[in-house]
Amino acid sequence: MASRQSQKRLTKEYKAITLNPPPYVSAKPNDENILEWHYVITGPPHTPFEEGQYHGILRFPSEYPFKPPSISMITPNGRFACNTRLCLSMSDYHPDTWNPAWSVATILTGLLSFMTGDESTTGSITTSDNVKKRLARSSKEWNNAENQRFTKQFPDLVAQNKVDVAARNAREQAAATTDSTDPEKPFDVRENIDSLDPEDRARLLVEQDDHSTPSFGVQRFTLVGVVVAAFIAAYFNFFSRT
């Protein structure tokens, strides 16, 4: 049960984090127990967690803010074991390093920083970036389908997740359809000139970019033209002297 002091402090922090949430972080207390907070971390860009959605829990002692909370993550993420207390400097593993001036925002910002790093601690796991990316991609679907605590605490995010997943699937399906077709490609003289008749060869050579580097086929065709022209010139020059 929350003390008056912890109740007052956590109520104040909820107002603060609602008005000014840290980047990639949101959090709210359980409607039935202010000592239990549910947070959501959105994977930052340019990390293996990009576009992932990670739900977890902070459990505060009644002595808060003089004692730290426990920290755990529920959504599979590839960085932390699920539903396992994490050993961080701002968690209940280290009450000796806890600072009462720290807040929920401070805790979650620190958790995000640790998550995107590679340090090891109790509760952390080691996986490849590919695994983290795969879990990030499936995280919204997992939260909606498998995470009852998430759906209870964040009904607005459940609805948004459905929209986001449907839009992503539509984009991927459209891209796959485009890739599976064989769109008409610009005619490549370098690959096809030898198969053309002389008239088409001449037309395509004229249409080529004057600044492009001639291909082997074009160079060979041009060389033949030069040789023929030289032969004709020599022929007429010979008869003009006779």
Curated annotation (Swiss-Prot):
Gene3D superfamilies: Ubiquitin Conjugating Enzyme
Region of interest called Disordered, as start-end residue ranges on this chain: 170-190
Record keywords, A-Z: ATP-binding, Endoplasmic reticulum, Membrane, Nucleotide-binding, Transferase, Transmembrane, Transmembrane helix, Ubl conjugation pathway
One protein family per Pfam: UQ_con
Chemical reaction(s) catalysed: S-ubiquitinyl-[E1 ubiquitin-activating enzyme]-L-cysteine + [E2 ubiquitin-conjugating enzyme]-L-cysteine = [E1 ubiquitin-activating enzyme]-L-cysteine + S-ubiquitinyl-[E2 ubiquitin-conjugating enzyme]-L-cysteine
Residues annotated as catalytic: 87
EC top class named in words: transferase
Transmembrane annotation, as ranges: 221-240
Main location: endoplasmic reticulum
Listed EC numbers: 2.3.2.23
Example GO biological process: protein ubiquitination
Places the protein is found: Endoplasmic reticulum membrane
GO molecular function per UniProt: ATP binding; ubiquitin conjugating enzyme activity
Domain UBC core residues, every copy: 5-156
Regions of this protein lying in the Cytoplasmic compartment: 1-220
Functional pathway: Protein modification; protein ubiquitination
Gene Ontology CC annotations of this record: endoplasmic reticulum membrane
Family the UniProt entry places it in: Belongs to the ubiquitin-conjugating enzyme family.
Functional summary from the UniProt entry: Catalyzes the covalent attachment of ubiquitin to other proteins. Functions in degradation of misfolded or regulated proteins localized in the endoplasmic reticulum (ER) lumen or membrane via the ubiquitin-proteasome system. Cognate E2 conjugating enzyme for the DOA10 ubiquitin ligase complex, which is part of the ERAD-C pathway responsible for the rapid degradation of membrane proteins with misfolded cytoplasmic domains.
Protein name: Ubiquitin-conjugating enzyme E2 6
Organism encoding this protein: Debaryomyces hansenii (strain ATCC 36239 / CBS 767 / BCRC 21394 / JCM 1990 / NBRC 0083 / IGC 2968) (Yeast)
Encoding gene (name): UBC6
